[in-house]
Amino acid sequence: MSAPTPLAEASQIPTIPALSPLTAKQSKGNFFSSNPISSFVVDTYKQLHSHRQSLELVNPGTVENLNKEVSRDVFLSQYFFTGLRADLNKAFSMNPAFQTSHTFSIGSQALPKYAFSALFANDNLFAQGNIDNDLSVSGRLNYGWDKKNISKVNLQISDGQPTMCQLEQDYQASDFSVNVKTLNPSFSEKGEFTGVAVASFLQSVTPQLALGLETLYSRTDGSAPGDAGVSYLTRYVSKKQDWIFSGQLQANGALIASLWRKVAQNVEAGIETTLQAGMVPITDPLMGTPIGIQPTVEGSTTIGAKYEYRQSVYRGTLDSNGKVACFLERKVLPTLSVLFCGEIDHFKNDTKIGCGLQFETAGNQELLMLQQGLDADGNPLQALPQL
């Protein structure tokens, strides 16, 4: 055992391996910059950060938009309606954007007979509110603290239904994204959480490939234990960005895979396959009592295409359940569009049809001239802006 070093010779003690001696700049800094251990941690982080930047990674987007090219852009589930519909939209300004909308519908089980909505948006704030003839109120508010942090609030109040409140926080870094949200959160006197909490993380590992996971915790009753699950996510974008693949392995055993393809300049195609694993109880044919369980796998596939032209947009889908659907949006005038959608279920011998009109009006002279394809001086525009 070596003898202890006298205090007078403390300066002769060698430095710890892998720790560089303090520089003159570090010795004049604060505790974290002058401390050798914290300095080593900071140097290691800088090296890792420099290596990540050399990989040329990009932001992978959010988990919510993992397969938006297929589910939102190509497929028509976001646009389909039944019955007759008329939309009257009026834009008052472009920056900041302020717009109101009146929606009338007849013969639809999903849409209310009348709904009014207002929208306001600028560089940092987005606010939208809706109210219908049944006095059901809904609204959402997005506020960007900076380019990376966005806070979101969704609220829905309906007669005869429980109130829904969702709080959400988005963080978009250069090569990853984090999202945390909670639905109807509440805490008891004992500090027990009830509601739904979801946290997701998506990280780019190469310029084309991103991997992530999503965790969910749900507890509706304070006396019962909560449920938790983890879903695994992946997204791959080709170098030319002409096709995108995304996959999800959800906590309930569902496997979802989708593929988006840019066929031509104005043609897009997408396919999505869902496999659901489950358990079916087996009962005794004579007694009717359960005697076991049997694993089952159910699946469905949907194929869709989108044709976008200068004055019209066409979407069509075909799935393995025998449903064929289409949606057509035709701009007859700069301020008038005609909507048509239809669906045929061959297995159930059922059909659905929807027709609608969409009017765009301007709240001032400048916007009116823009809708007519003219600038402030009355000269034709090269491209008609989208209001």
Curated annotation (Swiss-Prot):
Gene Ontology cellular-component terms listed: cytosol; mitochondrial intermembrane space; mitochondrial outer membrane; mitochondrial outer membrane translocase complex; mitochondrion; pore complex
Alphabetized CDD domains for the sequence: Porin3_Tom40
Major localization listed first in the record, in broad terms: mitochondrion
The keyword Transport appears for this protein: yes
Origin superkingdom: Eukaryota
Protein keywords: Ion transport, Membrane, Mitochondrion, Mitochondrion outer membrane, Porin, Protein transport, Transmembrane, Transmembrane beta strand, Transport
Signal peptide: none
Annotated compartments: Mitochondrion outer membrane
InterPro entries: Porin_dom_sf (IPR023614), Porin_Euk/Tom40 (IPR027246), Tom40 (IPR037930), Tom40_fungi (IPR005686)
Molecular function in Gene Ontology: porin activity; protein transmembrane transporter activity
Family per similarity comment: Belongs to the Tom40 family.
Function: Channel-forming protein essential for import of protein precursors into mitochondria.
Official protein name in the record: Mitochondrial import receptor subunit TOM40
Classification lineage: Eukaryota, Fungi, Dikarya, Ascomycota, Saccharomycotina
